[in-house]
């Protein structure tokens, strides 16, 4: 898709000016930066020829070390050596349940800060420090300032995690052209859009097992457009977790009950080394401090089986979501350093019945794809395919009765906007609370609250007459804006969804699974709640009518109406929908009679004092 260029007035670029854009893979364990030079994507090196930048920051009292310079301090000063900060991004202190050596401060429901030798540092600040180092590497390598950057994030990052990433980039002084899902970046890097242009639709699986996150996406390429059909994963499953499983095995083999922070850090380093060596060798040694254990591929596979099983279940679920069979998958692409593992590759072969594609360095493929996208977005390339990412969970708002009205369904391609009209519940209602939720259930109490705002200034009207247009808009970065406008007066309010913390991996999995498991139950509950809300509305309208016109009824009529009303109110305390519907029908018999009397009275009042010839003349 060629992008139209719109320059600032008086600031138009020269027609052949090349602007510098970079792609950044902000990884859990390693980060990379790449750019496009002379039409070719290139991963940028440091002065020692290294492309991988360890995502580590060490805070000493008088200095700060980054990347490889910070690595030695993981074992000697673990509390001040922040690794895998990506796992903390956009998450609350209460969400962080995995083992770590850090002192975290802050309230449980807020994003924490790390207590370091240089004071408190938030995950956003630490990520910004890593991004700044990558920016410096790019500027030194390219001898030019950077005009823009595309930064990749896991496909399963929610709004809070994406916003935290944007905040970190802004703090690092980067102009963010776009946040790009990592699997989508891999598809671009492999040029899957360039294959067999005349063939029919093609489906690809991107299996991305990085240092701290796992994502599986199914992409369809059709008529020049990439669309993510389905995506799934874990925000806390990756190479770090495989390392922890090896440490757990080693502790058991060595009969060690617990490790202090220094020992645990040393065991993690030994686990990572052994894991990487097993990609090339059948058997290696786990060496930590004065301990030494033999570890072969079979044992390693059994150790990490629990993690592999999780990836298998996600793969199967994503295939179901996409409504595809294995025969309909063209290729499987491996992404992330953890996919070098023989055990991981073997699982992929078994699940998809084909040899996975891994001709591009799995550590570099995401950065390469990000650089290609950055080159397109900055205006250097007129070629490219439109990439449509998807929303990982459904988005909606709360309606009367605690029900969820979905405006954007899970796996909807983004960017996307959806509008829907709502109305008031009570006469004279002048404000409306908009409660935005995320999840797959039909009741608000089972979904995740994203935010609330109030639309004030609704003109007083009879219930049901006001028209409130609510718009949900998700941009290309997956960030949500919700607005509400009353159509007659034009009053408007909106909220940008930037939750104070994100979903834990467990919560994300729970929201999806509960949506599947309780689908029938939720359908029945929705029907029950909708019936109750409608019945309550009828009762309130009837109550108001009786205040105004009860004199139209004789004693028997009034008594029968009150009896039917009381019976319905009593049934509303139960969850028996059949009894409620019968009570509604019984009340309707008497309320319809009352409504007819009221209508006749209003007609009489309207015609009172009007002559027959006046009425006849008005009809001519």
Swiss-Prot record:
UniProt xrefs under Pfam families: HSP70 (PF00012)
Keywords, in A-Z order: ATP-binding, Chaperone, Nucleotide-binding
Ligase keyword on record: no
Alphabetized Gene3D superfamilies for the sequence: 1.20.1270.10, 3.30.420.40, Actin, Chain A, domain 4 (3.90.640.10), Substrate Binding Domain Of DNAk, Chain A, domain 1 (2.60.34.10)
Molecular-function GO term, any one: unfolded protein binding
Top-level taxon: Bacteria
PROSITE patterns: HSP70_1, HSP70_2
Keyword Nucleotide-binding tagged: yes
A Gene Ontology BP annotation from the UniProt entry: iron-sulfur cluster assembly
CDD domains associated with the record: ASKHA_NBD_HSP70_HscA
Function of the protein: Chaperone involved in the maturation of iron-sulfur cluster-containing proteins. Has a low intrinsic ATPase activity which is markedly stimulated by HscB.
Family under the similarity heading: Belongs to the heat shock protein 70 family.
PANTHER family, per the entry: HEAT SHOCK PROTEIN 70KDA
Protein name as it appears in the record: Chaperone protein HscA homolog
Organism: Acinetobacter baylyi (strain ATCC 33305 / BD413 / ADP1)
């Amino acid at each position: 898709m060629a992008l139209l260029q719109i320059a600032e007035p008086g600031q138009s670029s020269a027609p052949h000016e090349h602007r510098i854009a970079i792609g950044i893979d902000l990884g859990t364990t390693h980060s990379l930066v790449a750019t496009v030079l002379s039409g070719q994507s290139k991963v940028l090196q440091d002065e020692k020829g290294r492309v991988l930048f360890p995502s580590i920051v060490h805070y000493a009292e008088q200095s700060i070390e980054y990347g490889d310079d910070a690595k030695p301090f993981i074992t000697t000063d673990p509390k001040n050596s922040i690794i895998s900060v990506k796992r903390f991004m956009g998450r609350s202190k209460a969400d962080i349940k995995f083992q770590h050596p850090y002192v975290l401060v802050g309230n449980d429901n807020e994003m924490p800060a790390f207590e370091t030798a240089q004071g408190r540092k938030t995950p956003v600040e630490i990520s910004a420090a890593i991004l700044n180092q990558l920016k410096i590497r790019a500027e030194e390598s390219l001898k030019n300032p950077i005009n823009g950057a595309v930064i990749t994030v896991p496909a399963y990052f929610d709004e809070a995690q994406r916003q935290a990433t944007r905040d970190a980039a802004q703090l690092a002084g980067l102009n963010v052209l776009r946040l790009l899902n990592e699997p989508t970046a891999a598809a671009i890097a492999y040029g899957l859009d360039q294959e067999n242009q005349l063939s029919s639709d093609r489906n690809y699986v991107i299996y991305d097992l990085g240092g701290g996150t796992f994502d599986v996406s199914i992409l369809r390429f059709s008529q020049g457009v990439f669309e993510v059909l389905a995506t799934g994963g874990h925000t806390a499953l990756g190479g770090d977790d495989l390392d922890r499983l090896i440490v757990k095995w080693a502790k058991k083999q060595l009969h060690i009950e617990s490790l202090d922070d220094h020992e645990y850090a040393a065991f993690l380093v030994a686990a990572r080394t052994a894991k990487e060596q097993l990609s090339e060798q059948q058997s290696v040694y786990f060496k930590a401090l004065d301990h030494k254990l033999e570890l072969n591929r079979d044992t390693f596979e059994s150790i990490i089986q629990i993690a592999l099983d999780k990836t298998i279940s996600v793969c199967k679920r994503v295939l179901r979501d996409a409504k595809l069979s294995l025969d309909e998958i063209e290729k499987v692409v491996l992404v992330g350093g953890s996919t070098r593992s023989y055990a991981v590759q073997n699982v992929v072969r078994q699940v998809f019945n084909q040899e996975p594609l891994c001709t591009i360095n799995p550590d570099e493929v995401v950065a390469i794809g990000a650089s290609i996208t950055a080159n397109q977005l900055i205006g250097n390339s007129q070629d490219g395919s439109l990439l449509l990412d998807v929303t990982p969970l459904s988005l909606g708002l709360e309606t009367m009765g605690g029900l969820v009205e979905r405006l954007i369904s899970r796996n909807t391609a983004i960017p996307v906007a959806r509008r829907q009209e709502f109305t008031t519940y009570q006469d004279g209602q002048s404000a409306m609370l908009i409660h935005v939720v995320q999840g797959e259930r039909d009741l608000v109490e089972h979904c995740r609250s994203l935010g609330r705002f109030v639309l004030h200034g609704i003109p007083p009207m009879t219930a049901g007459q006001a028209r409130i247009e609510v718009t949900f808009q998700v941009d290309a970065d997956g960030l949500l804006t919700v607005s509400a406008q009353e159509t007659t007066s034009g009053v408007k309010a909106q909220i940008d969804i930037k939750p104070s913390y994100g979903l834990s991996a467990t919560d994300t999995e729970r929201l999806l699974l509960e949506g599947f498991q309780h689908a029938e139950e939720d359908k029945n509950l929705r029907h029950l709640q909708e019936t109750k809300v409608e019945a309550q509305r009828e009762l309130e309208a009837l109550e108001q009518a009786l205040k105004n016109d009860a004199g139209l009824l004789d004693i028997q009529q009034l008594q029968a109406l009150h009896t039917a009303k009381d019976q319905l109110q009593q049934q509303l305390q139960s969850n028996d929908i059949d009894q409620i519907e019968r009570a509604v029908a019984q009340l309707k018999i008497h309320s319809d009679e009352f409504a007819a009397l009221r209508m006749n009275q209003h007609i009489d009042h309207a015609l009172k004092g009007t002559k027959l010839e006046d009425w006849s003349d008005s009809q001519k």
